[in-house]
Amino acid sequence: MQKRKISNSELNRLTPEEFRKANKNPIIIVLDNMRSHNNIGSIFRTADAFLIEAIYLCGITACPPHRDIHKTALGATETVEWKYFEKTETAIEELKSAGYIIYAVEQVENATNLDKLNINKETKI
């Protein structure tokens, strides 16, 4: 049995214009010196799916347009706002001054599982 690819309209995916106008979740993802272009594209795609406010790309993290990012982002670089910072610290300072709470995500010993965080709808992260 051959499987049919579902269209954007069947997925109820917003057009780029609709996405720009949509209410976003007050979350900004900061990518700190991420090397993998494919992972960067995947994060754009995930941010698009969850209506994330923006992505901040820092240091050596590649920026769109880039063919490897585009390949995995599947159009999300056209919808999700992004900004480049030479230094991650500058991005963090901007977010703190705008009232965001900063969380670092890393797989390390004694880390808190993301599903255990106590975050309410009004929290800007």
Question: What is the role of each PLM region?
Answer:
Residues 1-125:
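Post-transcriptional modification and biogenesis factors for structured RNAs
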